[in-house]
Design a protein with these regions (language model features):
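Conserved active-site segment immediately N-terminal to the catalytic lysine
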Residues: 171-183
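Active-site-proximal loop->helix
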Residues: 82-93, 111
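Active-site C-terminal subdomain of aminotransferase-like
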Residues: 4-5, 183-237
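General beta-strand structural signal in soluble alpha/beta enzymes
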Residues: 47-50, 73, 96-97, 126-127, ...
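A glycine-/small-polar-enriched, mobile loop at the entrance of the PLP active site in fold-type I
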Residues: 2-50, 54
Length: 237
């Protein structure tokens, strides 16, 4: 990506911008929110951020974790590598499951690490579903099952390339954070990102102490309930 954008979408984007606090825009937000929930196969709200997919993933990390938390990251490409860097930038303790670029992550390595964590120190497993840099699909369903068996850790998934192109049933797989971007399976220009959080993720949000402002998902959730946005969004997108 960016993927091809249909001509009908380009024409719609060419309209004069409407007010983001107007009733007309609220109607669009309401309809779009329901469609996003359908795409994610979730009953949870899907929040829209003006920013790239990295913004959605960073938001997923900083809204559910706290300083010094231990996380397990999967790294088998450029974006798995990026989430390791983001986690370390916020002072998280990072263990990494690696695989050679072009090869999928070993699901058994995640199972082994999670089963060994008898003191439940691992707070989240962070990985990419479809590694954009190589095209490799990681077995997110199986890894999420191992995380669920752990009992307390969250699954934070980069689905930027996969959502809209692959089946990503958020609720069925027990995913806690799903991040995506407009320029891939959505077939839109770059500029929007989307983050869905489970009830477990929102419970973690209540105790998260990592610094955040623009990417604080609390205000997004509060305004989404009113079919609005806490900041000026990319209206035409």
């Amino acid at each position: 990506g960016p993927t091809p954008v249909p001509e009908t979408v380009l024409k719609a984007m060419g309209r004069h911008p409407i007010g983001h606090r107007s009733g007309e825009f609220q109607t669009i937000v309401r309809r779009t929110t329901e469609q996003l929930k359908w795409l994610h196969q979730t009953s949870s709200d899907v929040l829209v951020i003006t920013g790239s997919g990295t913004a959605a993933m960073e938001a997923g990390i900083i809204n559910t974790l706290s300083r010094g938390d231990k996380v397990l990251c999967g790294d088998n490409g450029k974006f798995g590598e990026r989430w390791v860097k983001v986690a370390r930038a916020y002072g998280l303790e990072v263990d990494v499951v690696t695989a050679e670029w072009g090869h999928p992550l070993d699901t058994e390595a995640f199972r082994t690490a999670l089963e060994a964590d008898t003191e439940k120190q691992i707070k989240a497993v962070i990985l990419t579903h479809s590694e954009t840099s190589t095209g490799v699909i990681n077995d997110l369903e199986t890894i999420a099952r191992h995380v669920k068996a752990h009992g307390t850790a969250l699954t934070i998934a980069d689905c930027v390339t996969s959502l809209g192109a692959c089946n990503v049933p958020m609720d069925e797989w027990g995913l806690d954070v799903v991040a995506s971007g407009s320029q891939k399976g959505y077939m839109l220009p770059p500029g929007l990102s989307f983050v869905a959080m489970s009830d477990r993720a929102w419970a973690a949000y209540a105790t998260s102490d990592l610094p955040k402002f623009y990417l604080d998902l609390g205000p997004y959730r509060k305004t989404a309930a009113k079919d609005s946005n806490p900041f000026t969004p990319a209206v035409n997108l």
